[in-house]
Amino acid sequence: MIKKFDKKDEESGSGSNPFQHLEKSAVLQEARIFNETPINPRRCLHILTKILYLLNQGEHFGTTEATEAFFAMTRLFQSNDQTLRRMCYLTIKEMATISEDVIIVTSSLTKDMTGKEDVYRGPAIRALCRITDGTMLQAIERYMKQAIVDKVSSVSSSALVSSLHMMKISYDVVKRWINEAQEAASSDNIMVQYHALGVLYHLRKNDRLAVSKMLNKFTKSGLKSQFAYCMLIRIASRLLKETEDGHESPLFDFIESCLRNKHEMVIYEAASAIIHLPNCTARELAPAVSVLQLFCSSPKPALRYAAVRTLNKVAMKHPSAVTACNLDLENLITDSNRSIATLAITTLLKTGSESSVDRLMKQISSFVSEISDEFKVVVVQAISALCQKYPRKHSVMMTFLSNMLRDDGGFEYKRAIVDCIISIVEENPESKEAGLAHLCEFIEDCEHTVLATKILHLLGKEGPRTPVPSKYIRFIFNRVVLENEAVRAAAVSALAKFGAQNESLLPSILVLLQRCMMDTDDEVRDRATFYLNVLQQRQMALNATYIFNGLTVSVPGMEKALHQYTLEPSEKPFDMKSIPLAMAPVFEQKAEITLVATKPEKLAPSRQDIFQEQLAAIPEFLNIGPLFKSSEPVQLTEAETEYFVRCIKHMFTNHIVFQFDCTNTLNDQLLEKVTVQMEPSDSYEVLSCIPAPSLPYNQPGICYTLVRLPDDDPTAVAGSFSCTMKFTVRDCDPNTGVPDEDGYDDEYVLEDLEVTVSDHIQKVLKPNFAAAWEEVGDTFEKEETFALSSTKTLEEAVNNIITFLGMQPCERSDKVPENKNSHSLYLAGIFRGGYDLLVRSRLALADGVTMQVTVRSKERTPVDVILASVG
């Protein structure tokens, strides 16, 4: 029956695409009708439509066949049929890039452009500008100037929009039309004024002073076009973000005044601009929030949606500013548009008090099954934020999330819930068992491999430390029996972690691992064999190295290094220290909840891997070993100065490479042979400088300085460098960018650059700190006590220590429990050269904070460095 229905439907043509089965060769054959006399407009229109359809579907036209069809089409200009003529303009625009000698229609288009038929003039201008190149533009310049100030709005708008496109081809010619564009900007037509403002801005956007003057002029004289007002607000907002005046600027006053405009579009644009300004206080946000509050009760769904979506964004940073809208948002919970209702309730979750959480969760439960997965993810995001804000409400959240987890839904939705539950488990120790129980139940019927492996990893990490770890073994071993290879392998790893940390469970785990050795998959068998052999040794140090604490190196970096090792066989064993460290351990990274993810995630090279590759390509850096760590960029110039310079410190075992990213902001200068000369304050030795060959206006360039670390005193890791940028200046024409032949040497003093102890240490997470502590041993252990007299709270002390040392807090020890007078902070890292470094800091609060620091490493130097730096 279904097949019969489909056939009938296809024959009747109802709902089908008449161009679905077009063949290019047949259409080009039909195009010969263009040469017939007299011209048949109706048939020609149909064929042109087919050609446009094929072009827009991505059909490839060869140059010869496209040119033949184009030349045949030019004969259609002999017809006076308006629809056919306008279809010709469209076809010219589409075929301009694939046909040869398209300029043959220039005279016909120029004639239409300057003719008396207004209906032809606008489209003719757009088509003409599409086929015109830089050499021909001057020939039509006079006509373009006239068209820009034409009284017919469609002609003027066409000329202005075409001018915007022509800027890419010949900016200097279009710049001569600025007077006409200014005249068009005073037009009464809203679209002409909008397009004219766009042209004026793009002609001046590289000159901040000219943009400021333009804004000044239009903010004082006012505009008639609401579209132009929106553009003006965006320009003002962009300028505000770049200047230091901020909210004291007249530009901010202008944006605020637009909140009182008669057009809703302008009011919303102004409110959105204020909300997205950086460093906006709650007081400055208040007028914008008030306007959005009014929009919440608008009869137009689009306005209500825009308002609640924007308030949702405000609530992320300034929840207190949105509190005044809570009543309006509660009214929107019952909105017929489920998207609006969802955004309203998620906003309320961010702004509501702890007492309102239960009521809001009940309201969400009533309609959550009716909304799309995309908005369910938004709800989960809001719940996740709420868990961090009100940790005592985790039981309510957990119940709600577990119910959502049982409902039908796609991968992204399920992943968002799993990530949220994992976050609650990690942040609230008292919710651990309930969360793990819900996740165990979920993996019993989970069709997503990624989620199953993630949950198994969490069970292996958190399960062994629960009061009754044995209850999780059944759920994990079920995965070995029932699931695919990837999940079975993850389950084997989780079982090994239970055996490594629970002596009473070890015999049972060994039996289960022996069963896994009979698996059909290589990966599962190899893991089982490996873990079985490690566990049979019954050594805590081995367990810590090979089971608890995974690889701390970059996975893409390791893959590349191993591939290189196989290409160049060597008698030496592969050195793991030749691989860059991972910026953050794989198991520490929390997956961000995203609204859309269409492709499977590919492990992309990290920032560290990219730097490693860039530096390895420079001959001077070939023999200094693998990259250990790259710092965050440090700015060495003030904003609004002639040159913008920032530095990234690349640490190697015995060297530092300073990478200077330089930008020349002067359009009348070309800088050449740019270097940064560094004068160290201590026993650092500057070895070489690698210049940036040239720095044209606004184009970034990179220069490097190579420095050797002190040999005589390994603990002298901190230092200060005075920096001076030296270069050759060649003056140039700001308009053309052509430089003078002669240049002169000049220099520019930069801010001093500091190297601190944190630059020499890479963060690394140890999931089981106690095991790692025992693994390192006490051979080079040292302990000292310090008084932090200026520190008043334990939280402040913890944050200062973490920031100063640049190490990774373990066991969630960076969170200080409430109403405690003592706390233990556990830090882990790797010191330059690849040495494990562990710090245990016991803090006690009295008049100030007293700190007992114990440091362990397998080498003496890292221990001495930490104690010397803290002291």
Curated annotation (Swiss-Prot):
One Gene Ontology MF term: structural molecule activity
UniProt key word Acetylation: no
Keyword terms, alphabetized: Cytoplasm, Cytoplasmic vesicle, ER-Golgi transport, Golgi apparatus, Membrane, Phosphoprotein, Protein transport, Repeat, Transport
Positions of HEAT repeats: 64-101, 283-320, 321-355, 356-392, 395-430, 467-504
Keyword Zinc-finger in annotation: no
Swiss-Prot/TrEMBL GO biological process terms: endoplasmic reticulum to Golgi vesicle-mediated transport; intra-Golgi vesicle-mediated transport; intracellular protein transport; organelle transport along microtubule; protein secretion; retrograde vesicle-mediated transport, Golgi to endoplasmic reticulum
Pfam families for the chain: Adaptin_N (PF01602), Coatomer_g_Cpla (PF16381), COP-gamma_platf (PF08752)
SUPFAM superfamilies linked to this entry: ARM repeat, Clathrin adaptor appendage domain, Subdomain of clathrin and coatomer appendage domain
Record-annotated disulphide pairs: none
Subunit architecture: Oligomeric complex. Binds to CDC42. Interacts with JAGN1. Interacts with TMED10 (via cytoplasmic domain).
Sequence similarity: Belongs to the COPG family.
Protein function: The coatomer is a cytosolic protein complex that binds to dilysine motifs and reversibly associates with Golgi non-clathrin-coated vesicles, which further mediate biosynthetic protein transport from the ER, via the Golgi up to the trans Golgi network. Coatomer complex is required for budding from Golgi membranes, and is essential for the retrograde Golgi-to-ER transport of dilysine-tagged proteins.
Protein name: Coatomer subunit gamma-2
Organism, as annotated: Homo sapiens
Gene name as annotated: COPG2
